A protein has these predicted regions:
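Crotonase-fold acyl-CoA enzyme core
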Residues: 88-201
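Hydrophobic alpha-helical membrane-association signature
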Residues: 31-35, 79-82, 227
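A general structural signal for well-ordered alpha-helical segments in protein cores
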Residues: 64, 83, 142, 151-154, ...
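Hydrophobic/aromatic residues within transmembrane alpha-helices
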Residues: 16, 51, 63, 112-114, ...
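Glycine- (often His-adjacent) and acidic-residue-rich active-site loop
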Residues: 45, 53-89, 105, 252
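C-terminal alpha-helix plus adjacent terminal tail
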Residues: 1-11, 42, 161, 165-166, ...
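Conserved CoA-thioester-binding segment of acyl-CoA-metabolizing enzymes
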Residues: 1-54
Length: 261
């Protein structure tokens, strides 16, 4: 692994940290390639990945200086291809991804939040899409918020270039929780530890179902049948479900049983 992405192994979960603090963790080509390598190394290794940034920024998007240099050199200033790879690497990864949004998240940073399965932000985090100021549509973060937010809230981010705080992002449903900065990593890693207690196959199949059902299925019966198929795949992959019912019948609690958020 290089120096632009830092990885900490924590047992059943890992913390992957964007590590360009001098650039507010803007993602140049080299950082995107290292990030893809880090994601690949976590396949079949950890059940959960916490994604965060070094110092006071989560990710300020693409490296605009590199993009501008490319334009002057005649290189097409379009980082789309490897951003698509990053998008697919997270969404198709078997692990559950948790964004720990520790500060500024602009453009590509907002994309990373949308891509992750769960997200916790500092109350003061700043999330925004500056692309309209460059006469551009946010081609990755825009679709993400349009899927996850109401149309007016998505339009606010896309059309005004104004940033919202982590607290507002929680109220809008863009993140699950907003917490004081000092508590962010403690909360994110505690959540990672709780999620990592569950069966790996069940986590992966549930992740896939959470994405597939809203996007592909609009009829209740088909949705229920899809859910039945998901559980069949989990059962066929091992005996985790049988073990769970056996624990319950013997008077033991399964992870998550009998507790609220």
């Amino acid at each position: 692994m290089g120096t632009l992405i830092a990885v900490e192994e924590k047992g059943d979960y890992a913390v992957i940290r964007l590590n360009r603090p001098e650039k507010k963790n803007a993602m140049n080509r080299a950082a995107r390639r290292e990030l893809l390598d880090a994601f690949g190394a976590q396949r079949d290794r950890n059940k959960v990945v916490v994604l965060t940034g070094t110092d006071d920024s989560f990710c300020s998007g693409v490296d605009l200086k590199e993009t501008g240099t490319d334009a002057k050199d005649g290189t097409p200033p379009d980082p789309s291809s490897d951003w698509i790879e990053v998008t697919l690497a997270i969404r198709e990864h078997p692990a559950i991804f948790i964004a720990a949004v520790n500060g500024i998240a602009l453009g590509g940073g907002a994309t990373l939040i949308s891509l992750c399965d769960l997200a916790i932000a500092t109350q003061e985090a700043e999330i925004g899409m500056p692309e309209i100021g460059f006469a551009a549509y946010p081609q990755f973060s825009g679709p993400g918020v349009q899927i996850q937010l109401t149309s007016k809230r998505a339009a606010w981010l896309v059309l005004t270039a104004e940033r919202i705080t982590g607290a507002t992002a929680e109220a809008w449903g863009l993140v699950n929780r907003a917490v004081p900065r000092a508590a962010l990593m403690m909360e994110a890693e505690a959540l990672a530890g709780r999620v990592a207690r569950f069966d790996a196959t069940a986590l992966t199949e549930c992740k896939r179902a959470l994405e597939a059902i809203p996007q592909r299925i609009s009829e209740w019966r088909a949705a229920f049948e899809y859910g039945i198929d998901v559980n069949a795949r989990i059962r066929n992959a091992g005996n985790a479900q049988q073990q769970g019912f056996a624990r319950f019948e013997s008077g033991l609690r399964n992870p998550g049983q009998g507790k609220s958020c």
